[in-house]
């Protein structure tokens, strides 16, 4: 009877694997920008300029501010169909917003408060229209006004971000030279308003033939960027403004050739090389894709291809992910906006920093599709909370980390110096973040020299009956949600006793701050 009872108890305990961590604390293997985790707004938001006014909602401002500092890229497919018209009247919503910005906040708020409520009720229909247009691959020109630029710049700067604005590259003269006349008008207005903006030209030129029937080679695109650099130098404000490009898509054979040709003719005109990456097609993606080591590892191959081209043409140029997410085509419904998407997002952040990518721009902070950080009602999704923890805990210096285990691809670990701006931590502390892609609990054993150190655990688990397909997440057992429209919750750690193993449940991820680690690389 006793033997039977012991057998039952053993079977009731979840299976567990133990892996030893190998951590390099003596010197960093690289460093990333303080704006490493940055955001995007898809330019399709301006298809109906009324909805740009949503950016003044206090809740969206609070959520964005939590992820600062960073860059906010306004770009995407619609970039190459935006026409600036400085003479077009603002929409009613934009006029109310301008009134709000010009007056005392308390005085103007009652009139402005009507705007977001009305727009939020209309947004779901607009989102469907945008997704339908994207799937039909039918694109038409959209006019943007001075008010649209005003709102974008105000949202970015007031939230702690630098706006990166994508100019239309499909405006062409005979002979396929870029027609910069509309860009001159836009630059002139922004300079007049003293808007501190960085710039791009075009979006995924490797797909221009599909989108518009026009094919432009990399050499010509390089000349276009040189021309844009000359235009910027005509404005004292933009003489040293940052210019990024070429914003190519996945580095397949044709795209690699396009990028290589561009770098030879225009690589010296840009400050950083930008490219885009998605793991899978949103229409056909499965839950298994989000948990597959093979799918996650494919990102490393793409990085290798892009870095190789850059080093062979303009050595030393920084490389950015100018747009990225889990699945292209607006994301994978019921997957890209759930807890399971965090495996792709956290692994991408870790691998990008380890392989030398300087900035990663997440598509999108808010907008149409399933891959956003904030839903249509401004409720933060699991990837938002994951991003918030990353911003709070992870510093810019990258350290080496690995696991000693037969299948080392399923527990995936990354190590950085802890964010020095965090009030609880000090120089020499390190932050480990880890993913468990297996269906059993993974125990991570720290190296012996760290057994005496205290560890703060920040374990993220799905909340509710939907398990890893949940749109809610809990931190150390507490549901994460905003306190009110202007207040993010406190992110409470769970202190682990010195010598504890780091227990990572099946299909989960989390952060571990090793206090008083005295890592030489972080001092």
UniProtKB/Swiss-Prot annotation:
Residue ranges of coiled coil: none
Signal peptide start-end: 1-18
Glycosylation sites: 141, 196, 436, 439
One term under GO cellular component: membrane
Catalytic residues as annotated in Swiss-Prot or TrEMBL: 204, 323
Recorded superkingdom: Eukaryota
Enzyme class: hydrolase
Subunit note: Heterodimer; the active enzyme is a heterodimer of the 60 kDa and 45 kDa proteolytic products.
Protein name (database record): Heparanase
Organism: Gallus gallus
Gene: HPSE
């Amino acid at each position: 009877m006793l033997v039977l009872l012991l057998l039952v108890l053993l079977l009731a305990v979840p299976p567990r694997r133990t892996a030893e961590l190998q951590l390099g604390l003596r010197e960093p293997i690289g460093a990333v920008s303080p704006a490493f985790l940055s955001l995007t707004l898809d330019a399709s938001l301006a298809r109906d300029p009324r909805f740009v006014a949503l950016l003044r909602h206090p809740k969206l401002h609070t959520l964005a501010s939590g992820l600062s500092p960073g860059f906010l890229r306004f770009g995407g497919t619609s970039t190459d169909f935006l026409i600036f018209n400085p003479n077009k009247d603002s929409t009613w919503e934009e006029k109310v917003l301008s009134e709000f910005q010009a007056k005392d906040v308390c005085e103007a708020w009652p009139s402005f408060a009507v705007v977001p409520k009305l727009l939020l009720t209309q947004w779901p229909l607009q989102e469907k229209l945008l997704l339908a247009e994207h799937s039909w691959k039918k694109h038409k020109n959209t006019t943007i006004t001075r008010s649209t630029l005003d709102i974008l710049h105000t949202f970015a700067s007031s939230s702690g971000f630098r706006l990166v604005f994508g100019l239309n590259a499909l405006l062409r003269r005979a002979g396929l030279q870029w027609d910069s006349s509309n860009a001159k008008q836009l630059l002139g207005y922004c300079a007049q308003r003293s808007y501190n903006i960085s710039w791009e030209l075009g979006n995924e030129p490797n797909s221009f033939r599909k989108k518009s029937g026009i094919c432009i080679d990399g050499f010509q695109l390089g000349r276009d960027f040189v021309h844009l650099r000359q235009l910027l130098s005509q404005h004292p404000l933009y003489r040293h403004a940052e210019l990024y490009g070429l914003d190519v898509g996945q580095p397949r054979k044709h795209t690699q050739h396009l990028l290589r040709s561009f770098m030879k003719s225009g690589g010296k005109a840009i400050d950083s090389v930008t490219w885009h990456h998605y793991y899978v097609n949103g229409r056909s993606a499965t839950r298994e894709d989000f948990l597959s080591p093979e799918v996650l590892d494919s990102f490393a191959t793409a990085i290798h291809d892009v870095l190789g081209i850059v080093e062979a043409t303009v050595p030393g140029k920084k490389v950015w992910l100018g747009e990225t997410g889990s699945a292209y085509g607006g994301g994978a419904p019921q997957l890209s906006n759930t807890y399971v998407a965090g495996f792709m997002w956290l692994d991408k952040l870790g691998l990008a920093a380890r392989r030398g990518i300087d900035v990663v721009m997440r598509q999108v902070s808010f907008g149409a599709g399933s891959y956003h950080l904030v839903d249509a009602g401004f409720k933060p999704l699991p990837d938002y909370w994951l991003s918030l923890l990353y911003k709070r805990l992870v510093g810019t210096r990258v350290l080496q980390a690995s696991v000693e285990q037969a299948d080392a691809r399923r527990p995936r670990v990354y190590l950085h110096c802890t964010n020095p701006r965090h009030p609880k931590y000090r120089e020499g502390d390190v932050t480990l973040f880890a993913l468990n892609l297996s269906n059993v609990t993974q125990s991570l054993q720290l190296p012996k020299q760290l057994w005496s150190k205290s560890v703060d655990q920040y374990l993220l688990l799905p909340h509710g009956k939907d398990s890893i397909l949940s749109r809610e997440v809990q931190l150390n057992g507490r549901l994460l949600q905003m306190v009110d429209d202007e207040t993010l919750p406190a992110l409470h750690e769970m202190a682990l006793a010195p010598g504890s193993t780091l227990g990572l449940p099946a299909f989960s991820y989390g952060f571990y701050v090793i206090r008083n680690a005295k890592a030489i690389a972080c001092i």
